[in-house]
Amino acid sequence: MHNKKVLILGLARSGYSAALTLNKLNCEVIINDYNTEEKLNSNQINELKELNIKCIFGSHPDDLLDKSFDYLIKNPGIRNDHKYVLKANELGIPVINEVELAYRLLPKDVNILSITGSNGKTTTTTLIYNIIKKSGLPVHLAGNIGYPICSILDKVKSGDIIVSEISCQQLANIDKFKPNIAVLTNLSPAHIDFFGNYDNYKKVKAKLFKNQTSSDIAIINNDNLDSINETKDIKSKKLFISLTNKKDVYFKDNKFYYHNELIMDRDLMFLKGNHNVENAMDAILVAKLLNINNDVIIDVLKNFRGVEHRLEYVDEVNNIKFYNDTEATNIKCTQIALSSFNEPIILFLGGLERGQNFNDLKDYIKNVKVIIGIGECRERVREFANKNNIECFIFEHLKDGFKKMVEVSKTGDIVLLSPASASWDQYKECEERGAEFKKYVEELKNGKRN
């Protein structure tokens, strides 16, 4: 990758990190983003300009990409039908992404553990990283978890381990990328707007295994039929987790087993929900493959409080427990969250109008006593609640809904922000919605809200 001419399409963290990496390789780099400079990260832009990296913002000029370029590096959030991608294909210019770039620059004997899936991948990635780190093995966390792999290249040494969360958008433009251990947590319909249909989405997810050989490991959820079907022809050695059958790691009588070896009792885990049992099983299986001591596994699983914004326990106020699941931007995630509690639930539901079918929650709401509809689709939330005879209040903004929650909540309730909706009607990112919810909980605890 030295001395190449490269067009980077899209700034963000991955484009910025790729640009810095390529600059060190004496590449001629041009970075282009449709957003104007005012809408982008000024610190990133200033650093790029100081390095004499050409930046073109505010448009995608028709004449920018030509056959003089060696590579087009595309931000994962940009679709493959973008005009530059189509033109690159016509000109025979390879289209890759930051993950692929980083992979080509890593020491050959680095061990790569990659996790993908429709749900649970961030929690699973974090659990695996925490276990390996506590064991004392040299490990780095990167990928779709906030740290581009390019950003850690200078820290990685031969023999190190990289634990990387890989999204479907990142998988869409890999070429040679090959993890030593690849984990597929599960498959369910998601990102249909990006990939066109569920079949396309599943095929992209399965690309995580495409370069693996028989000496590499694939970890599959045996209880998820789509995962089984989509990986039936891969060359990797397949290992399985299961809640219901005796597999490599399995769950029986409320206990975790690796083959016939008892690992721990589920009650020792802080995290709620069967989905977190599955996440823990993936982490246990990876840990056993790395010969990590059971005491380390148990210690991490006992003390892990979850990933921020993913069914995150926030606090308890007046014997009412608050959970922030703002990352539940689809129906499936909210189904999982609702299945995690037996106590009465006050549910915050709604956000960006995407035509999401709230009726798909009807089999999961037996413990929901009040629904507070928020955001753009709040009227449809009320229709759903009325249809299922659940008391409902609707508000445009979360802050007003939170005030109503204070009025109607009682000792022993669970207050759950699990919106089954994206947040872009009011927030730049769903994390902002979660942070606002947590702020209101803190204010309530400190006596500032009533």
Write out the residue ranges for each language-model feature:
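Nucleotide phosphate-binding/pyrophosphate-handling subdomain across enzymes
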Residues: 2-5, 17-25, 138, 264-368
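Phosphate-binding loop of NTP-binding sites
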Residues: 4, 23-24, 62-69, 76-222, ...
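Short beta-strand "acidic-cap" motif of Rossmann-like dinucleotide-binding folds
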Residues: 29-33, 141, 163, 240, ...
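Beta-strand->loop->alpha-helix junctions that form or flank phosphate-binding loops
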Residues: 58-59, 96-101, 235-252, 298-302, ...
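NAD(P)-binding Rossmann-fold cofactor-contacting core
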Residues: 27-45
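C-terminal helical cap/extension that packs against the catalytic core
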Residues: 45-46, 359-413, 449
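Glycine-rich, highly charged phosphate/nucleotide-binding loops
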Residues: 49-63
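Glycine-rich Rossmann-fold phosphate-binding loop(s) that bind the pyrophosphate
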Residues: 11
